[in-house]
């Protein structure tokens, strides 16, 4: 965990996603003593590189959840700032290629990008060099967009018969998971959220049911939600906005987004951010109309 913190401090962006941190926290042995390859947390494997003195120089997490069904491994890695440009990143990438049964040297005829995916958060120059060296090509892009909250915000106009209320812990989980699955059936990570995943996040320090806004009809049936998050530095996040497909087209997603922005501003957030798929042009246009601009890009490279 210390290596990940040092990497984030140096780069200004977290080297791994939230789900990796949650899996590490789920098993203290992994947090405090990561072996070269350890797979005792379901769906995870861990690779480390140490220097000659035994100091941790680099770390890679491999998500194996889709290996049996889709044959895909998804990895994220971090190299300690003191050990960069000394081969630690290359050793980790080669270990990942070996784990995926891929040759170190890419074949010119190999156009498949589905077997191994490796994230570069913030499109770090070192990651771009490694991708070029090992024949990894861009397979997916995730934009981080943001805006200040000290300017005028639109009104959250709701469709007739729709109200917004706060999430009720221990009550609303099944409905949220149902709508989330329908809203994100196309999304490889978000659409797979289970009730257990949701309850795990409820135990995080940042979780606040008052910032988990649910849009319901007159029968209290869930139509959509806006789950907000406040980071330790005070930055707000449009964490997830999900609308049931049967309800889409009436502006509910925009109204939920605005309601969440107002909530975050009321909580003292000076700025807000969100993540959106780079090819989701419809969502990007909505956010741009709400004065969001692109901050940076996460890239998933594949072979």
UniProtKB/Swiss-Prot annotation:
Pfam families with a match to the protein in the record: Acetyltransf_1, Acetyltransf_7
Binding-site positions, 1D-myo-inositol 2-(L-cysteinylamino)-2-deoxy-alpha-D-glucopyranoside: 18, 189, 229, 237, 275
Signal peptide span: none
GO biological process: mycothiol biosynthetic process
Listed EC numbers: 2.3.1.189
UniProt entry keywords in alphabetical sequence: Acyltransferase, Repeat, Transferase
Catalysed reaction, written as an equation: 1D-myo-inositol 2-(L-cysteinylamino)-2-deoxy-alpha-D-glucopyranoside + acetyl-CoA = mycothiol + CoA + H(+)
Binding of acetyl-CoA 1, residues: 77-79
N-acetyltransferase domain ranges (all copies): 1-150, 162-303
Residues that hold acetyl-CoA 2 according to the record: 241-243, 248-254, 280-285
Class of enzymatic activity (EC top level): transferase
GO molecular function, one term: mycothiol synthase activity
Subunit note: Monomer.
Function (record text): Catalyzes the transfer of acetyl from acetyl-CoA to desacetylmycothiol (Cys-GlcN-Ins) to form mycothiol.
Protein name from the UniProt record: Mycothiol acetyltransferase
């Amino acid at each position: 965990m210390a290596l990940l913190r040092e990497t984030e401090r140096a780069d200004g962006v977290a080297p791994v996603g939230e789900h990796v941190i949650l899996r590490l926290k789920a098993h203290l042995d992994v947090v405090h003593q990561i072996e070269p390859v350890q797979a005792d947390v379901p769906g995870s494997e861990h690779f480390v590189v140490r220097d000659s003195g035994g100091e941790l120089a680099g770390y890679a997490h491999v998500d194996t959840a889709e290996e049996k069904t889709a044959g895909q491994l998804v990895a994220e890695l971090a190299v300690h700032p003191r050990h960069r440009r000394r081969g630690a990143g290359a050793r980790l990438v080669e270990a990942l290629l070996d784990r995926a049964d891929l040759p170190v040297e890419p074949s010119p005829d190999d156009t498949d990008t589905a077997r191994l995916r490796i994230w570069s958060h913030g499109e770090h120059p070192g990651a771009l060099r490694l991708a070029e060296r090992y024949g990894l090509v861009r397979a997916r892009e995730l934009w981080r967009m943001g805006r200040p909250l000290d300017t005028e915000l639109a009104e959250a106009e709701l469709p007739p018969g729709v109200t917004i209320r706060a999430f009720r812990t221990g009550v609303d989980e099944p409905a949220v998971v149902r709508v989330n699955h329908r809203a994100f059936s196309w999304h490889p990570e978000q659409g797979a959220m289970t009730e257990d995943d949701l309850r795990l996040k409820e135990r995080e320090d940042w979780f606040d049911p008052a910032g988990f806004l649910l849009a319901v009809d007159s029968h209290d049936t869930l139509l959509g939600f806006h789950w907000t998050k406040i980071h330790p530095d005070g930055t707000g996040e449009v964490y997830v906005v999900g609308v049931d497909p049967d309800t889409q087209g009436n502006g509910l997603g925009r109204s939920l987004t605005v309601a969440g922005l107002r909530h975050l501003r009321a909580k003292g957030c000076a700025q807000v951010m969100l993540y959106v798929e780079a090819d989701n042009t419809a969502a990007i246009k909505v956010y741009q109309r709400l004065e969001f601009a692109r901050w940076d890009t996460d890239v998933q490279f594949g072979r």
